[in-house]
C-alpha cells in the first residue's frame, strides 16, 4: 500500500487541500529544523495570517529531530522507532471542524483504509476532556480509553498562545512479543504503540498562564509514516520495514555483513543518517562548524563511526546516500536532480573526517583502559577528541554507551572555556508574532507600487515604536516605523537590502527612510523624523537614487548564477546572497575553490551578457509553468501558486520578486573581487558593477600609477621581481630569535610559529647549527597554515611527523626521513597542531 498517497487522497475526499512538504529549514527563528507537520501552518494557527479559503489541509511533511528542543539523535539505532528524519502525515482544520469530525476521520482511516482491527486499538484522552471521552465511546469500549494528565495529553506551542488537550490512538502489538514490566497500556514499554496524535486546539494561554476558549477551535494531527509502514508489514521495528530494505542491502554489500548480525544497531544508524544527510544536502544545508551545518556534520560523523565498527575504513556513506536519492526520486524529484552534488559533498566530508577518525579511535580506546570505577570518561580527553580529532561530544558519549560510561562534563566544559558553541545557530527569523497580532487585525496589506515608480502620493496609516506599539504622532529625531497606504519602497528580500529614501510633507523633507522590511505581508519603512508627523498625514514617498545601483547589482546576481551554472555545472544553486548599492555577495553550492581560469570565464560570461543590452521581462504565471520553463528557484523559499518570473532573454530566468534594470547594458560592467569558502560545499563570490565598478577601476589605475613611481620602473612585473629578490636576500640573514629551543636528552627541539621568512631555509639553517635536532616551524599565509620540519640524528621520520600534524590542520604532508613540508586550511587548529607537534617530539625522545 502507498500509505502516503492513501492518506492524502482520503483527506482530499473529505474536503482538504493537499499541501506539499515544506523545506526542512523553516522560516522560523524558534526552530532549528521543521519538526512537525503543523510548522508550515503556524502563522495560521496563531492568527498572524488569515485562514485560507479552504479551511482544511493535509500534508505528508518531512521532519528532522536532531538538535534543538526535539532531538532523537542519541536514540537512533537503539530503539525501534526513533529517527532523525521521518515523514509526518497530518490533517488540519483552521476553525472549521473540531473533535467529532477529527475523531471520526481518524477512526475511519485507521480501521477501513489501513485495516487495523478495532479490537487491537486503544485510546488516550486528557483527564479533563470528557467530550473526547464520550465521542470515543461510540467506537471503542470504555475500558480501552485511558485518561492521562498534562504531561502526556496536553499540547501547547509555547509558554503562551494556542494550546489544548490531545487524544492518541494506540495499537496493541501483541502480548507474545512484549512481556516486560512496562508492557501495559499507559506503561513505558513498546507493546502499546502510539500511531496517531490528535490535538484539539481550543484554548489560548495568556502570559500569566490563564486559559481562555478560542473563538474558532482548530485541529492539528500527526502520524509517523515509517511507524505505520512497519505495523502494516507486521514488523516490530521501523527499520525492518520495506522502506529501509534498499538501504540495508547497500550497507550489507559494503560491509559483507548480514543485517541480522550483532551489528544491527550500526546498520540502522547508517540507514537513518544516510536519509537525513541526503535530504539536508539536497535542500541546501551544508557541512559547517555551527548551526544546522554542524548538526549535519554530527549526523555524518556518527554514521562514520558506526561504519568503522563494521570494518569500513574508507568513505562509504556517500554510496548509501546515493541509494536514498534514487529511492525517493518519484516523490522528491530534487533528490535525483542533485544526486551527483549530494554524493560528492558527502564524499568530501567523509574524507576529511576519516583522516582523523582512526587516530581519534586509538586515543579513545587507550583512554578506555583508564576508566575509573564510576565509569567516568576523562573530560579532558573528550575535549581533545572534540577539538583535535573532530569528535562531537554526543559521538563520544555514543561510543561510551556500550561500556556503561559517560563523559565528565565538568571537565569537558572547563576545557571548552571560550570556544564557540558550535551547536548554536546563526539564522535570521521573524519578529515576535505577538508584536503584530493587533496590527494585522487593524490593517490590510498595503499596496506596493515600486515596480512602476520610485515616487508616489500616500497616506501614513500608522506609526509604531521599536516594539511595534502604535503611536498617534511623532517628534523630530525619533526613529519610528511607518505603514503607508501605498509604498514605492521595496522591502528587504531575495538578498536585496530594503529601499531608503524620504517622506515629504508640504514640499518639505519630513523624514528620512532608513530601511524597509516586510512583516507578515505588511511593508514597514523605518523613519528618522525631521518634522513632526501624525497618523493620517498625506505625504510624498520618494525612493533614493541608490535604488538604480541596487537594481544593477541584483540583475548582475542573476547573470552571475547563470554563468556559474554554465561554467561549473547545473549542480550550482543559490545558498544565500546580499545585494547592495555598492557590491553583491553570492553564495552557491560547489565542492571546491574556483581556479583563475574558471573565475575569468564566469566574469567574461557576465560581461558578455551586459554588453548585449538584453532587455528584462517580467511575467506572472503558475509555479509549475515557471519550473517547466526552467526558472531557477530557491529551495528554502515558500512560493505562492502564482509567481513572478524575471528573465533576460536566453541568459537568465528566475523566480524573483525584486527590482531589476530594464536592460543589462545599464549594469555597465562586472568585476569579481573575491572567491572564498563559506562552509563545506558552499563557495562565495563578491563582486561589483555599475558606479562601484567604475570607481574600482579608477582607484586601481591610481594605485598602478603610484606603484610605478615607487618602484621607479614602468614595468611593474620587473620592478616587483627585483623587490622580492631583495627581500628574500634580507630574510636569509638569521633564524628569528623568538623561536623556542629546548634541549632534551642532548637533542635540540624547536617547535614554533614565525610571521615571515622562508621556513624551509630556516629548517636548513637549524640543521646546520645543531648536531641532533627535531624542528617544526609553522607560518600562516593568507587562509592557510604552512609547516616545515627537519630531523637530524633523532628517532622519528620527518614525513611521518609532518603528515600527522598536517591532518589536524585539515591537510596532508610529504617529504623525506630528514625533511618534510605540509599545510592545511584549518587555521583555528594551529594551537592544537603546535601542541601535537611538541608532544610527538617529546614522546620520541623519551623512548
From Swiss-Prot:
Cofactor note: Binds 1 zinc ion per subunit.
Catalysed reaction equations from the record: tRNA(Ala) + L-alanine + ATP = L-alanyl-tRNA(Ala) + AMP + diphosphate
GO CC aspect terms: cytosol
Enzyme class: ligase
Record-linked CDD domains: AlaRS_core
Listed cofactors: Zn(2+)
Gene Ontology molecular functions: alanine-tRNA ligase activity; aminoacyl-tRNA deacylase activity; ATP binding; tRNA binding; zinc ion binding
EC number: 6.1.1.7
Subcellular location(s) of the protein: Cytoplasm
This protein's record includes keyword Mitochondrion: no
Keywords in alphabetical order: Aminoacyl-tRNA synthetase, ATP-binding, Cytoplasm, Ligase, Metal-binding, Nucleotide-binding, Protein biosynthesis, RNA-binding, tRNA-binding, Zinc
One GO biological process term: alanyl-tRNA aminoacylation
InterPro entries reported for this sequence: aa-tRNA-synth_II/BPL/LPL (IPR045864), Ala-tRNA-lgiase_IIc (IPR002318), Ala-tRNA-ligase_IIc_anticod-bd (IPR018162), Ala-tRNA-synth_IIc_core (IPR018165), Ala-tRNA-synth_IIc_N (IPR018164), Ala-tRNA_ligase (IPR050058), Ala_tRNA_ligase_euk/bac (IPR023033), DHHA1_dom (IPR003156)
Residues that bind Zn(2+): 554, 558, 656, 660
Primary localization: cytoplasm
Summary of the function given for this chain in its UniProt record: Catalyzes the attachment of alanine to tRNA(Ala) in a two-step reaction: alanine is first activated by ATP to form Ala-AMP and then transferred to the acceptor end of tRNA(Ala). Also edits incorrectly charged Ser-tRNA(Ala) and Gly-tRNA(Ala) via its editing domain.
NCBIfam families tied to this protein: alaS (TIGR00344)
Free-text domain note: Consists of three domains; the N-terminal catalytic domain, the editing domain and the C-terminal C-Ala domain. The editing domain removes incorrectly charged amino acids, while the C-Ala domain, along with tRNA(Ala), serves as a bridge to cooperatively bring together the editing and aminoacylation centers thus stimulating deacylation of misacylated tRNAs.
UniProt similarity note: Belongs to the class-II aminoacyl-tRNA synthetase family.
Name under which the protein is recorded: Alanine--tRNA ligase
Species of the source: Helicobacter acinonychis (strain Sheeba)
